[in-house]
Each structure stands twice: as structure tokens, then as C-alpha cells.
Amino acid sequence: MPSPTSSSASVFSSHLFFVFCIFSQIAQSYAQFNRFFDPSIPEQETVLTDYDYNMIGHFRENDQWFVNDSAMYNPLRFEGDIANSGLNSRSINTFFGDSPLFGIFGVQRNAVRQTYLKWEQARIPYTISSQYSSYSRSKIAEAIEEYRKKTCIDFSPKSAGDLDYIHIVPDDGCYSLVGRIGGKQPVSLGDGCIQKGIIIHELMHAVGFFHEQSRADRDEYVKINWSNVEAGLQDQFDKYSLNMIDHLGTKYDYGSVMHYAPTAFSKNGKPTIEPIEKNVEIGQRAGFSENDIYKINMLYNCPTFTATTLAPENTKRVKSITKKVTSATGSPLSKKGEIGSSIGDKGDRGDNSVLSSLISIHSGLGKCEDRRKDCEFLARAGHCESRFSIRFMTENCANSCGKCIAEEKRKEVCEDARTWCERWANSGMCNQTVFKDYMRQKCAKSCNFC
């Protein structure tokens, strides 16, 4: 029979081990927490720097096709991660102007549908919370770089004149507003959200897109297992008419980064949404699919480009395709299950041409001058030449960056910023409304704009 002393020692050891386990879990959680963000740092609006972009390679990891994206499925938000005020399955018709009052004038056909408010000239001003760690900033920079390489969407640092902008902040989980709502609108990348694919997903909401499985034709492609859906959350799987969500001429995309994962809002861990097509999977968070890229460029009237699709590493999950996007009407109508990630022209979004800088200054928008008190400091730090901050510096610190030249000297630097400008000009793109602003910036010489 054990002595009272040994029994007490055993109980004490057990308690000590239990306390150790608790503190160990807390320490691990704290370490993980600080890897992504530190709430003890005062919240301030910052922008990404050259250092953040340079750290992409340092922190780069193999893109995971599927990740734990449970932070995207908040039952209190519309479709889990959409935070537009008052938006739900019952109010969405009014939200889109799809009511008898608005329908008389066909407003839903002109002002809304898939993105009811687009960002002007595809430029989305942004700020980022000071609470993010270097690792998180690099992952956000990596996602933004994907937009820069593959679309004409320009996430640019907020300037003093930008009233509407997104603020990327580590709030409660992952969420965004859809489209340009006005003012300072949050994009939350909190705990569980610092994955490139998840960041791309939330930013794509801000660009103006809803989820893929909300399409009117989704029942032809996926099956909803209602018996596995958490009670009271059935409306998170509603679908919406073409009056509200524009498919932009593309077929259903199983591989869209905007698609629900198989167990979204599951009450028992079993699939709530399953592909009808065999040998395909849904809910990937590695990055854009080809159709994601096409739809963004289609919606924002981006200039034509050639997209070469790379085969995914795991060919058992998806098939590979190669498409040439030749015009705004030539959509990649992929077959069921065919997805991929496109690589656009890497130079097409480069805003480091002298011509682009000069045009933005001499476009009649105001005097060529510094608009910030810290311009000289920023210029000395090299931000005038950085490809990541040159547009911001040109708009706000033109004088310190040496961009203020006499108007009569403008023609001396009139040039094309792209090698294919003459060919595009001969095709008539200089005078086409959807391309005119782009051609004015990149092909001023061929278009005789200077």
C-alpha cells in the first residue's frame, strides 16, 4: 500500500505536468500568434515597402493546394467571409437593385451584377496594419504581386487624395467587403488567414467578386448535402440569378480560388458540397485559376494578353490547359474540371516608366508639387526609383523625385513603354474607350498623344 507521502507526490507531479502542458500550449499559441501579428503594437496605417517584397523569397513556401481555411466560414457573416453591412440571403435582391422599383429601369443590368461597384481605372488604394509581422507582410506582398503579374488590378499605397481605400487589418478571422463600398473598408486577415491563396481570395472579394458556388447554374456542377449542413446555415448555400451575379461568359470553375471548400459549414465534418464531375476537387487555396484571372481582366476591361497555363504539380487533382486570351470576348470556356494558374506579361504592370510618371503629373489633375511633408526623406530613402512605390511617390512627391519638368520639354521624352504599342495602335486601340487610358499611359508615342 503506497504511503501518503508518495500519493501526495504523485498527485503533485500530475498537477505539475498538467500546468506545464497548459503553459506549453499557451506559449505555442503566443509564438504562433506573434509569427503573424502583434496586437501590442499600436495600430497605424502603413504601406508595404521594398523590404516586404524582397522578403517574399525568404519566406516563400510551396503553395499548398488545400489549407485549413475554417477561419473563412463565420456563420454570422454572409457566405462566411463577406462583411457588407446588412447583406444576407434575404436582402441581396435589394442590395443588387433587383427589386420591382429598380427593375423598371434595368438598374441591375448596368450598375451591379457580379461587381456592383468597380474601382476606378482598376486602382485599389490600400493601407496595411502596423501590427503584422514581417512574415505576414511578405505573404500579403506575395498575394498582391500575383495580382500585379496576372491582372491589371493595381493595389497602390493610399495617397492623401484617396477617400476610398481598403485597410488590411488582423481582425476577427478572414473577411472582406465586396467591391468598392466607399471610405475606409476593412479586409481582415486575422488568425488562420495568412496563406497566399486565402489572401488572394479576400482581395478578390474587394475587387468585386462573390463565391463561385453562388452561381445560378451551380446545381449542374455540384451537389449540396443538406443533411450535413449546420442547422440554420442553409442560406449560406443559396444561389443567385444572373441579374445579380454575372458569370462573364465562363463555365463553372471547380478550381476557382473563390469556391467553397468541401466541408464548409459542416455540422459533422462530412462534405456539404461535392462536385458532380468525377476526379476533380474544390476549395483550392494555392492561387488563381485561369478563369479567375480571365474574369478579373474581363470585368476591368484590361488590355488583351496571352496567358500560358502551367500544369499543376499534382495532375491527379486537375487537368492542365493552355488558352490564348485574344479579346474581351474570347473567354477561356474551360471544360468541367480543367483549371490552372496563368502567367501574364510580367512587364505589363510595371509602373516604372518615365512616361507613365510624366503623364500622371501633366494630366491636368493639379500642380506638380510635393503633397507630403516627408517627401524629401522618402526620396532620399530610394522610394522614387522603387518599382513598388514609384506610382505613390509620383503622385505625392513629384518635386522631390525630380518629376516636375517644364511642359515644353514633355515631347522630348514622348515614348512608348511597351514594345507592342505600334501594333496595338494600328489595331485601333488608341481610340477605344476601354483601352484609351491605358494606351495614353503606355503607348503615347504610337497613339500621337504627345
UniProtKB/Swiss-Prot annotation:
Binds 1 zinc ion per subunit. The active site is at E202. This is Zinc metalloproteinase nas-13. PROSITE patterns: ASTACIN, SHKT, ZINC_PROTEASE. It is found in: Secreted. The lineage of its organism: Eukaryota, Metazoa, Ecdysozoa, Nematoda, Chromadorea. GO terms for cellular component: extracellular region. It comes from Caenorhabditis elegans. A motif (Cell attachment site) lies at residues 349-351. Residues 110-303 form the Peptidase M12A domain.
